[in-house]
């Protein structure tokens, strides 16, 4: 999974016709090349534009409102112990920015965030309510990924033990599902890969149909599949678009199958 919340945070979903404030576009091939317009998130189907991560959405909550909210939550015996030792270690003055708003629910980024995401232990934090009546919904570490429509999941890309065929327009890579999928062979469930090519990088975006909810978390070795490029990889870096920002594709410690 992309994020394990402590406790469980409610996923923030919406339809394309009625987006909550701060949410960008769901990932589609047409915007794979423009990170300023896609939505990124830490899990679930909701997200926000990368452009709001450094300073947050303007004009939503004031410093006084948030400090008062943090003070109230830290005074609540239901939350005090966990919040004081984790999310709000710095107390009411913990740095924050608003990432997303869904009605009376606010998703905040705590700690240091930049346009590339959280840094140095920064977290996401969700609270709901209004001045004088706040409740904590959850939060956790954030491993950013572009947000997908419901029913799809990212697969992780790795290089094979023999390395990449840099002279081919169809270099082989390994794919691994990131959700619990009962150890299934992911290949029948893969979508069409999207490759964004520049003079220095090739970024692969590859998804699969999400497994059933009752899937077990039995793992399996990466499966051998081929990317389709417009020109040979050459000396360009191969990046995995299942993260934000995309990360360098590296060799798996487990031999690929298939």
Where are these regions (language model features)?
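Extracytosolic low-complexity repeat regions of secreted or lipid-anchored proteins
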Residues: 86-144, 201-252
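N-terminal export and membrane-targeting signals
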Residues: 1-3
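C-terminal motif of bacterial Sec signal peptides marking the signal peptidase cleavage site
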Residues: 7-11
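Extracytoplasmic low-complexity, Pro/Thr/Ser/Ala/Gly-rich segments
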Residues: 15-106, 110, 143-196, 243-258
């Amino acid at each position: 999974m992309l994020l394990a919340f402590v406790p469980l945070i409610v996923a923030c979903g919406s339809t394309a016709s009625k987006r909550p404030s701060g949410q960008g576009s769901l990932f589609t091939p047409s915007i794979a090349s423009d990170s300023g317009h896609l939505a990124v998130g830490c899990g679930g189907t909701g997200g926000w534009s990368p452009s709001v991560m450094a300073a947050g959405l303007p004009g939503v909550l004031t410093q006084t409102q948030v400090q008062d909210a943090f003070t109230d939550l830290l005074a609540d015996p239901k939350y005090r112990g966990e919040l004081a030792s984790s999310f709000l270690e710095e107390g009411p003055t913990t740095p924050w920015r608003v990432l997303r708003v869904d009605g009376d629910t606010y998703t905040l980024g705590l700690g240091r965030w930049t346009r590339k995401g959280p840094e140095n232990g920064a977290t996401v934090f969700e609270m709901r309510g209004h001045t004088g009546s706040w409740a904590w919904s959850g939060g956790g570490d954030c491993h950013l990924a572009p947000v997908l429509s419901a029913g799809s999941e990212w697969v992780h890309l790795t290089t094979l033990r023999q390395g990449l065929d840099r002279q081919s327009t169809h270099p082989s890579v390994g794919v691994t599902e990131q959700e619990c999928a009962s150890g299934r062979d992911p290949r029948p469930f893969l979508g069409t890969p999207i490759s964004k090519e520049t003079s220095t990088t090739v970024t692969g975006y590859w998804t699969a149909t999400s497994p059933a909810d009752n899937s077990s978390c039995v793992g399996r070795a990466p499966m051998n599949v081929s990317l389709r490029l417009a020109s040979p990889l050459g000396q360009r870096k191969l990046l995995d678009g299942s993260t934000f920002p995309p990360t360098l594709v590296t060799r798996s410690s487990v031999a690929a199958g298939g």
